[in-house]
Every structure is written in structure tokens, then in C-alpha cells.
């Protein structure tokens, strides 16, 4: 017993199982307890592998669980195919020859040998993987489990051979042809159904089809999967998962090639030939006539399948074209209704424009009439105002003329009065002077000339005399004025 902490820690680590693997937890725990017990006893001198090995092992276990689910689904389809193959073998004519009891066992030993070969190859691939080996005792335990599995498989197969051994039946060529033809028709119908399911379900359908084709060659192996479920350990589960993965990948690649190349009929014929060969290998006499009838029926089925594909394509084109035509018709109707609506809208807008223009013209004519009436009224008012102003002016002129006439009359009367007053003053002055001469001013006479006329000299003294005599202060005298000359 080692005291290394790392060894104890790694030994106590447990793998993580998924929920779908809970039904086998008891078997796994028993196997793990046995392996741990052996590890603690015999692994004391061995270098323990690194931690990454445990992680890789857990990944393989998870992949094994996932592949086991797919394998279980394919196993159910295998059982159904085996049951159908058993019914076909009962109807087939093979018991007339002496080698009937030997050939089925030889045939059934072939799948056993192939299965052991797959398990051994998978185990060898796992051993050749660059991952470190955990311990030698674990591999020894795995080998022992494989041997037990092989022995249990052999026993189960022998029982299945005895149960499925065909009954003695005398066959003719016609019976063999009819039997193989019926069998071929059944297999063709089933493969058509399987192919349609594979086309719609993807990888799951491809795995089921691959399992069906693989089991068709080994129609007598009834109890293989049940023995594997209860006796194989984790290594056998991983190996079977790898084998199933390889078959699934191969089947999926074949399906993809068939789907892209349009050769589904050939694939159906190949699967039918494999199934018929696996079911008819129990007899050595059915080698020539059944194969010929199978080939003829296979060709007919291929032609029928191609015709069905053409009909499907035509139906698919019709399904594609009908919605397109309906969409085009709907769009055309919408376009027509839209054009009519736009046309009506345009007509309505034109009518509205015409009505608006007519209304605007009527409004403009009304405005013009009102403006003309206003201008007439204004001209009339201006004319009346002018005439009134003229009348006022005329009356004013008349009043001014009357007033001027009155003023002139007053002025004339005042002038007359002044003249009379001046005459009176002059008379009074003449009376005061007495006998002096009087001179009436005429034309342009002045005091200087009057002094020269009367005194012979126009000296200032003479002029001053005349002034004093007449009471003048200046030289201004007027026409018609009488001057006293002293």
C-alpha cells in the first residue's frame, strides 16, 4: 500500500456518468470496485499515469454512452429485421440438400468471427493510441471479459441456429423464384420506407439504415446485443462504440453520395442484394435462378423508383409553381386596383382644381366689379367735392369783391374828405397871409424853380421864405397845390 497522496487522490476519483446511463450503474460500480481492489494490491510498483489520462477516459466513456444510445436504437431495428429474416428463411426452399445443417452454422460463425475481429481491432487501436496505459491488470480483466463475451455469444448463437434451422421442404425452380421475388418485394418496400425516414431524420435514420444493412448479412445472430450489454466492461463499450461510429460514418457517407448523385435506386438494389444474400446463404443450390429473378425484379424496381422520383419532382415543381402563380395573380390584382384608385384620385384632383379655378375667377370678377363701383363712387364724390369747392370759392370771391368795393367806397369818401379838409386849410392860410401872390404847382415844379421864377434866384434864403410862408417843412410839394409867394 503506497502512501503517496497523488496515487490515493487519483484512485478515489470517480468518472461522471450521464443520466441515460443510470440503468447500468450497479454493474459499473461492481467493475470499478474490482478494478480498484486489484489496483491497490498489484499497482504498488507501477508509475501512475498523469491526470490527463483520466480526463481522456471520461471523454471516451461519455462518447460510449452516446454511441450506445444510437446502438440501442439500431438494435431494435436489427431485431425487427432478424424476425423478418426468420420468416423469410422459413419460406425459402433449402432443405433438399445434404449440407443444410452444416451451412447455417458456418454462416452464423461468420458474424461471430467478424464481431470478434471488430472488438480485437478496436482494442488494438485503443492500445496503439499514444495515451499512457493506466495499469496492466485492467487490460487483463478486459481480455477476460472479452473471452467470456465470446463464449456467451457462441452459446447464444448456437441456440439461435437451432431455433432458426429451416424445416425440410422440397423446392422447385418456380417456388424458389417466387419465394425470392416475394422476399425481394418485401425488402424493397422496407428499404423505401427506411430511405424516406433517413432522408427526413438525418443522422439517426442513417445509423438505423446502417445497422439494418449490417444485420441483414447475419440474419441468425439473435442474442448478441443482450450478451454484450451485461458482460462487457467500459473498454468493450468504447470498442463497440468505435465500431458503431465507423459503420455509421460509412453509411452516412454512402447516403450523402447517393442523395447528391441521384442513384438511390442502385443503393436500394445493393442493400436488397446484401439482404437476399445473407438470408439465402443457408442453401447452396439457390445460386443461379433466384439471382436471375432477383436481378430482373431489381431492375424493375429501379425503374419504378426512378419513375416515382420523377413523379415526386413533378409534384414538387407543381407545389413550387402554384404558390408563385397565386402570388403573381394576387400582385397583379393589387396593381390593377391600385391603378384604378390612383386614376380616380387623379380625376378627383383635376375636378377639384377646375372648381377651384372657376371659384377664383368668380371671386376675381366680383373684386373687379367692386373696385369699379368704388372708383365710380370715388369719382362722383370728388366731382361733387370739386363743385362744392368751386361754389364756395365763387361765393368767397363775390364776398371779397363786395368788401373791396365797400372799402374802395370808404377810401374814396375818406379821400374826398381829406381833400376838402386840405382845401379848407389852404383857404384859411391864404386868408391869414393877406395880399401875397399865389402859385399853383404844375408838372415837375419844385420850391427851387418857383423861387427862381418869382425871385430871380433860387438861393436858399428865397426857398426858406416860401417855406415859412406856406408852413412847409421840406421840399415836397404836389401838383395842383397853391403856394403863397411872399
Swiss-Prot record:
InterPro entries in the record: LysM_dom, LysM_dom_sf
Natural source organism: Staphylococcus aureus
Ranges where the LysM domain occurs: 437-485
Membrane side Extracellular: residue ranges: 2-204, 341-486
Role played: Promotes binding of soluble elastin peptides and tropoelastin to S.aureus cells although it is not able to promote bacterial adherence to immobilized elastin and, therefore, is not a microbial surface component recognizing adhesive matrix molecule (MSCRAMM).
Protein keywords: Cell membrane, Membrane, Transmembrane, Transmembrane helix
A Pfam family this chain is assigned to: LysM
Biased segments, Low complexity type: 204-225, 278-297, 403-431
Gene Ontology CC: one annotated term: plasma membrane
Polar residues composition bias: residue spans: 64-85, 233-246
CDD domains for the chain: LysM (cd00118)
Compositionally biased intervals (Basic and acidic residues): 1-40, 103-117, 126-160, 180-199, 247-259, 300-314, 361-398
Top-level division of the source organism's lineage: Bacteria
Domain comment in the entry: The elastin-binding domain is located between residues 13-33 at the surface-exposed N-terminus, whereas the C-terminus, containing the LysM peptidoglycan-binding domain, is not exposed on the surface of intact cells and presumably remains buried within the peptidoglycan. The presence of the TNSHQD sequence, corresponding to residues 18-23, is essential for EbpS activity but not sufficient, additional flanking amino acids in the amino- or carboxy-terminal are required for elastin recognition.
Cytoplasmic side of membrane: 226-319
Topology versus the membrane: Multi-pass membrane protein
Gene3D superfamilies linked: LysM domain
Ranges where the record places region Disordered: 1-314, 351-440
Positions of transmembrane segments: 205-225, 320-340
Chain segments carrying region Elastin-binding: 14-34
Compartment(s): Cell membrane
Official protein name in the record: Elastin-binding protein EbpS
Amino acid at each position: 500500500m503506497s502512501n503517496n497522496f497523488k496515487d490515493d487522490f487519483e484512485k478515489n476519483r470517480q468518472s461522471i456518468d450521464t443520466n441515460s446511463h443510470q440503468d447500468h450503474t450497479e454493474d459499473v460500480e461492481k467493475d470499478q470496485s474490482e478494478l480498484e481492489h486489484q489496483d491497490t494490491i498489484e499497482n504498488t510498483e507501477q508509475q501512475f499515469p498523469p491526470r490527463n489520462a483520466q480526463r481522456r477516459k471520461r471523454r471516451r466513456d461519455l462518447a460510449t454512452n452516446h454511441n450506445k444510445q444510437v446502438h440501442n436504437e439500431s438494435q431494435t431495428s436489427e431485431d425487427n429485421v432478424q424476425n423478418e429474416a426468420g420468416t423469410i428463411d422459413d419460406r425459402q426452399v433449402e432443405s433438399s440438400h445434404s449440407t443444410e445443417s452444416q451451412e447455417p452454422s458456418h454462416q452464423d460463425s461468420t458474424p461471430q468471427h467478424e464481431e470478434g475481429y471488430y472488438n480485437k481491432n478496436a482494442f488494438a487501436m485503443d492500445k496503439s493510441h499514444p495515451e499512457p496505459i493506466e495499469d496492466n491488470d485492467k487490460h487483463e480483466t478486459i481480455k477476460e471479459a472479452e473471452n467470456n463475451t465470446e463464449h456467451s455469444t457462441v452459446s447464444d448463437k448456437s441456440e439461435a441456429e437451432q431455433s432458426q434451422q429451416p424445416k425440410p421442404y422440397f423446392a422447385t425452380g418456380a417456388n424458389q423464384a417466387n419465394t425470392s421475388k416475394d422476399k425481394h418485394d418485401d425488402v424493397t418496400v422496407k428499404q423505401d420506407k427506411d430511405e424516406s425516414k433517413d432522408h427526413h431524420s438525418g443522422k439517426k435514420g442513417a445509423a438505423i439504415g446502417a445497422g439494418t444493412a449490417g444485420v441483414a448479412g447475419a440474419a441468425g445472430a439473435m442474442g448478441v446485443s443482450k450478451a454484450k450489454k451485461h458482460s462487457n466492461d467500459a473498454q468493450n463499450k468504447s470498442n463497440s462504440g468505435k465500431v458503431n461510429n465507423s459503420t455509421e460514418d460509412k453509411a452516412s457517407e454512402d447516403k450523402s453520395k447517393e442523395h447528391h448523385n441521384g442513384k438511390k435506386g442502385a443503393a436500394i438494389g445493393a442493400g436488397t442484394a446484401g439482404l437476399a444474400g445473407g438470408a439465402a446463404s443457408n442453401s447452396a443450390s439457390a445460386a443461379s435462378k433466384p439471382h436471375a429473378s432477383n436481378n430482373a425484379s431489381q431492375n424493375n424496381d429501379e425503374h419504378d423508383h426512378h419513375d416515382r422520383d420523377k413523379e415526386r419532382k413533378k409534384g414538387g415543381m407543381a407545389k413550387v409553381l402554384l404558390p408563385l402563380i397565386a402570388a403573381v395573380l394576387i400582385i397583379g390584382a393589387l396593381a390593377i386596383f391600385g391603378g384604378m384608385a390612383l386614376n380616380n384620385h387623379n380625376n378627383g384632383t383635376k375636378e377639384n382644381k377646375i372648381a377651384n379655378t372657376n371659384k377664383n375667377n368668380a371671386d376675381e370678377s366680383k373684386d373687379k366689379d367692386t373696385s369699379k363701383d368704388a372708383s365710380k363712387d370715388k369719382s362722383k364724390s370728388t366731382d361733387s367735392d370739386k363743385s362744392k369747392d368751386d361754389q364756395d370759392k365763387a361765393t368767397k370771391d363775390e364776398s371779397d369783391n363786395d368788401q373791396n368795393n365797400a372799402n374802395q367806397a370808404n377810401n374814396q369818401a375818406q379821400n374826398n374828405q381829406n381833400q376838402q379838409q386840405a382845401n379848407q386849410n389852404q383857404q384859411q392860410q391864404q386868408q391869414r397871409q393877406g395880399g401875397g401872390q399865389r402859385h399853383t404847382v404844375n408838372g415837375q415844379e419844385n420850391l427851387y424853380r418857383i423861387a427862381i421864377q418869382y425871385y430871380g434866384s433860387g438861393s436858399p434864403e428865397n426857398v426858406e421864405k416860401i417855406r415859412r410862408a406856406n408852413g412847409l417843412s421840406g421840399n415836397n410839394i404836389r401838383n395842383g397845390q397853391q403856394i403863397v409867394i411872399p
